[in-house]
Amino acid sequence: MIRNALLVLVFVLIGTISAATDADMTTDSGKQPSNINQLTLVSPEGKRLLRQGSVKEGGVHDATEERAFIVTPLKNSLYRILAAFGLKPQTLYVQLGIRTGMANALYNRLYHSYHRWYATYGPRVYG
């Protein structure tokens, strides 16, 4: 029961993080809107163009910048909570139905992100 509630909380926060990441990419492109409320008015096509513009202007982008999105403080704290409750990536893999191929992209993204975090920062077992 607690695990299901925790999974719902994680899904809600992952959606929030995705929206915040898009807003950060929009503001990082150097073409900031005059009003903070205008961020919601930027279409997905406009966001894509802003991202492309920031990549062209920025120069060299290494893999650490791409991976920086999984080490945000909110995700890090959520993954620590999941690890503290004993939820392993394999548990998510089974519970979310990823092994059956019926899971949507959000579940796959959550699983892969948590799996990478768990491999890097999760509890170490030496036996």
From Swiss-Prot:
Please describe what this protein does.
Answer: Effector that is involved in host plant infection. Contributes to virulence during the early infection stage, by inhibiting plant defense responses induced by both PAMP-triggered immunity (PTI) and effector-triggered immunity (ETI).
Highest taxon above the source species: Eukaryota
Name the lineage.
Eukaryota, Sar, Stramenopiles, Oomycota, Peronosporales
Domain-related comment: The RxLR-dEER motif acts to carry the protein into the host cell cytoplasm through binding to cell surface phosphatidylinositol-3-phosphate.
Q: Where is this motif: RxLR-dEER?
A: 48-67
Spell out the subcellular localization from the entry.
Secreted; Host cell
Report keywords, A-Z.
Answer: Secreted, Signal, Virulence
The entry sums up its family as follows: Belongs to the RxLR effector family.
Expression induction: Expression is induced during host plant infection.
Q: Which cysteines are joined by disulfide bonds?
A: none
What name does UniProt use for this protein? RxLR effector protein CRE6
GO cellular component terms given for this protein: extracellular region; host cell
UniProt lists the gene as CRE6
Instruction: Give the residue range of the signal peptide.
Output: 1-19
Give the organism, scientific name.
Phytophthora infestans (strain T30-4)
This protein's record includes keyword Transport: no
